[in-house]
From Swiss-Prot:
<keyword id="KW-0418">Kinase</keyword>
<keyword id="KW-0067">ATP-binding</keyword>
<dbReference type="InterPro" id="IPR050249">
    <property type="entry name" value="Pseudomonas-type_ThrB"/>
</dbReference>
<dbReference type="Pfam" id="PF01636">
    <property type="entry name" value="APH"/>
</dbReference>
<comment type="similarity">
    <text>Belongs to the pseudomonas-type ThrB family.</text>
</comment>
<dbReference type="GO" id="GO:0004413">
    <property type="term" value="F:homoserine kinase activity"/>
</dbReference>
<dbReference type="GO" id="GO:0009088">
    <property type="term" value="P:threonine biosynthetic process"/>
</dbReference>
<dbReference type="InterPro" id="IPR005280">
    <property type="entry name" value="Homoserine_kinase_II"/>
</dbReference>
<keyword id="KW-0808">Transferase</keyword>
<dbReference type="GO" id="GO:0005524">
    <property type="term" value="F:ATP binding"/>
</dbReference>
<keyword id="KW-0791">Threonine biosynthesis</keyword>
<comment type="pathway">
    <text>Amino-acid biosynthesis; L-threonine biosynthesis; L-threonine from L-aspartate: step 4/5.</text>
</comment>
<dbReference type="InterPro" id="IPR002575">
    <property type="entry name" value="Aminoglycoside_PTrfase"/>
</dbReference>
<keyword id="KW-0547">Nucleotide-binding</keyword>
<keyword id="KW-0028">Amino-acid biosynthesis</keyword>
<dbReference type="InterPro" id="IPR011009">
    <property type="entry name" value="Kinase-like_dom_sf"/>
</dbReference>
<protein>
    <recommendedName>
        <fullName>Homoserine kinase</fullName>
        <ecNumber>2.7.1.39</ecNumber>
    </recommendedName>
</protein>
Length: 332
């Protein structure tokens, strides 16, 4: 969440006329991230997030905002889009679609432990099941077709070894995506970007017996319909790794995956292709980070991510991937 489009006080005052949210108390840009312009907005009626969508179109946006509303209605803690005075969930600001959503309670946990991974695993499975009857369909826009389109633009900037890995893994994933087993994998709406900084935790009540309480998932603007296992792989590749080496932390990975299975057990096809999907999840973010690093857009507040992080993860997943952990029936 960077700031590509600046919003002045007069811009904000004009925009807020379309909302019944009271008077503005505070407003500031959010510097992290790379896709949209985001701002914390505090009014006399509560705390919110204003997002200006830099790439998503008005035709694409209903998928994301309606998905958040659908999930919230099924008990999944996500930001709730705030309707404007005309009932619409978004409008136009500086010629771009923009929306206001409620701000979740809690803070990101950037050094998660087993207890955090358990909470994330269970809620991710609940989210997947809650999305099964969501009527809108839109593919993950950062999947295989996007890789195939953008890798050629990246390869002039990278080393020979990196080019070999980019092109070799792309061929591997194209074969996997074209297989009968891939077609048989279950799926539906996925977050597709459930990193540590897109999940909030709040203090658990003393009488719950839990050390932490999940506050919610947010930043659904990379969401799309995909295989659920891809969403799990993306999550594990961030929540359950040594950040310096990319090596999986077995304790955290097992905790997240076992917790997920208490809600939705994995299929035989998913178990066979866990390695392929972990590689796909790493490849997706390596490609996008390379693209943003070498072909950046202008932004007022932009902190590009290190592409080497996901290169290390991809190489590690190719070399070593444990099987999905089993779970006893009694734990279901």
């Amino acid at each position: 969440m960077a700031v590509f489009t600046a919003v002045s006080d007069s811009d904000l005052a004009q925009w807020m006329r379309h909302y019944a949210l009271g008077d503005v108390v505070a407003f500031r840009g959010i510097p992290s991230g790379i896709e949209n312009s985001n701002f914390f907005l505090t009014t006399t009626r509560g705390e919110y997030v204003l997002t200006i969508f830099e790439k998503l179109t008005a035709e694409q946006l209903p998928f994301y905002l309606d998905l958040m509303r659908h999930l919230a209605g099924h008990g999944v803690p996500v930001p709730d889009p705030v309707p404007r005075d005309d009932g619409a969930l978004f409008g136009t600001l500086h010629g771009k679609p923009a929306a206001i959503v409620t701000k979740l309670d809690g803070a990101a946990e950037l050094a998660p432990g087993v207890e955090h991974c358990i909470e994330v695993g269970q809620m991710l499975a609940r989210m997947h099941l809650a999305g099964r009857d969501y009527p809108r369909r839109q593919p993950n826009l950062r999947s295989l077709p996007w890789w195939q389109e953008n890798v050629p633009a990246i390869v002039p900037f990278v080393t020979d070894a990196q080019r070999a890995l980019l092109e070799g893994e792309l061929a591997h994933q194209a074969r996997f995506f074209g297989s009968e087993d891939y077609a048989a994998l279950p799926g539906g709406p996925c977050h597709c970007d459930l990193f540590r900084d897109n999940v909030l935790f709040a203090h658990a009540a003393p009488d719950t017996g839990h050390a932490v309480r999940l506050g919610g998932f947010f930043d659904f603007y990379f969401a799309g319909c995909d295989k659920w296992l891809f969403d799990v792989a993306v999550t594990v590749n961030d929540w359950c790794v040594d950040l310096a080496t990319g090596v999986l932390d077995t304790a955290r990975a097992d905790a997240l995956l076992r917790a997920y299975q208490t809600v939705r057990p994995f299929t035989a096809e998913e178990r066979r292709h866990w390695s392929d999907m972990l590689r796909a999840g790493a490849y997706r973010f390596w490609v996008s980070r390379l693209y943003d690093f070498y072909l950046p857009r202008a932004a007022e507040m932009l902190k590009p991510h290190d592409p080497g992080h996901f290169e290390r993860i991809l190489r590690e997943r190719i070399a070593h991937t444990p099987a999905l952990p089993e779970i006893q029936t009694a734990c279901n």
